[in-house]
Amino acid sequence: MRVWTVLLGAVLLLAACQADVQDVETKVKAKWEETVEVFREYVNRLSLATDDITEQITSSQMGKEMDMLIKDXVAELHAYRKDVEERLGPQAVVMRERLHTDVTVLGERLRVDMEEAKTRVQQYLGEARQVAGQNLEDVRSRVGTYLRKLRKRLAKDTEELRRKLEAYSKEATQHLETVREDLEPLREKGQQRLETLQQALRDQGQRLREQLEVRAQEMRGSLDRAATQLQEWLEPFLEDIRTQMQGLLDKLQXKEQQ
């Protein structure tokens, strides 16, 4: 188990280092591509494993690890496909259907080739334990030749899938750009309408304030005029009352002096 863990760890580390170098030189690989690359390197390392290592690796251990890599690659491939489908949008029905069909067919081909590689490696490990010396070299040479062909098929499957997905991803990006370009005039028009409405509301508010100010001034003028008219109307009565009161005061003062 320990040898198996070390071997798998070495494969993953090597694949990660290769991915880092390639990412600097080219572009970042999708996760499903990285998983297939790990699987291919895994197959290669197992086919080149020394006698003492092959004796310690059980088919069940190897099968579980390779099954996990196959499962991860298929799941990551479908996740990548869904991401591209979402970017294509619901309007691109035909393109989405083509993408789904292409990835399903090519993905199944990749899965079958990975399953076959796993079977061949298990077969190699089983035969390697039963022979020794020159016979082991013959088995290794025969199986190694077939595994090299399988690795080439895996590389071809991966490249074909990558090209397809890259083309669809490019179309999805162009589709999004087209949608943005189509929506931009609407956005600008909506912005202009909003600004026009805001300005109209500001103008209407200003006119309303001016109208209210004029009305207030008119009301103040009306009240002032009404007060003046009331004062003018009451003034004779007040003057008459003042005269009468003064007369009464004069009479009272005269009586007091007598």
UniProtKB/Swiss-Prot annotation:
The keyword Signal applies. GO terms for cellular component: chylomicron; extracellular matrix; extracellular space; extracellular vesicle; high-density lipoprotein particle; intermediate-density lipoprotein particle; low-density lipoprotein particle; very-low-density lipoprotein particle. GO terms for molecular function: cholesterol transfer activity; heparan sulfate proteoglycan binding; heparin binding; identical protein binding; low-density lipoprotein particle receptor binding; phosphatidylcholine-sterol O-acyltransferase activator activity; phospholipid binding. Belongs to the apolipoprotein A1/A4/E family. Its main location: secreted. The keyword Nucleotide-binding does not apply. Residues 112-173 are annotated as: 3 X 22 AA approximate tandem repeats. InterPro entries: ApoA_E (IPR000074), Apolipoprotein_A1/A4/E (IPR050163). Sequence repeats lie at residues 112-133, 134-155, 156-173. Residues 1-19 form the signal peptide. It comes from Alligator mississippiensis (American alligator). It is found in: Secreted; Secreted, Extracellular space; Secreted, Extracellular space, Extracellular matrix. GO terms for biological process: acylglycerol homeostasis; cholesterol efflux; cholesterol metabolic process; chylomicron remnant clearance; high-density lipoprotein particle assembly; intermediate-density lipoprotein particle clearance; lipoprotein biosynthetic process; negative regulation of amyloid fibril formation. This is Apolipoprotein E. APOE is an apolipoprotein, a protein associating with lipid particles, that mainly functions in lipoprotein-mediated lipid transport between organs via the plasma and interstitial fluids. APOE is a core component of plasma lipoproteins and is involved in their production, conversion and clearance. Apolipoproteins are amphipathic molecules that interact both with lipids of the lipoprotein particle core and the aqueous environment of the plasma. Keywords: Extracellular matrix, Lipid transport, Lipid-binding, Repeat, Secreted, Signal, Transport. Homotetramer.
